[in-house]
Amino acid sequence: LYATKDRKLVACGAIEQKFWSAFCNAIGLADEYANDFRAPAATCDAVAKVIAARTSDEWRPIFAAADCCTTIVVPLEEAMRDPHFVARGLFAHSVESASGKTLPALPLPIAPEFRDKPGTKKAPPPGKN
């Protein structure tokens, strides 16, 4: 995770070389840091400085255009309104806490073909599975 200029976080999951290369190109990382096996700490510091130079709103379209497994971390409330998640029904479930409060919950498994029907289920009391 890397902090942006406006203190939001960028999550980068560029594990495969093609995604790492796309990420380095997208952020304009200096070539000397692209091979993170040489000096991983220096690469991490360089990426942090580059990401910190722009706001999340500046980075969002850059990452959207690049196939680099990178995104801006958003609060739960914003994620619940994301059209992609809404279309997939990821927040169609909820649980009820021991105090009776209804909370949004991700269905498990996430793949819809393996889920029970949407609905509200009571969460077990703390310590009970």
Segments and roles (model prediction):
Residues 82-96:
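Short, surface-exposed loop/helix-turn segments at secondary-structure junctions
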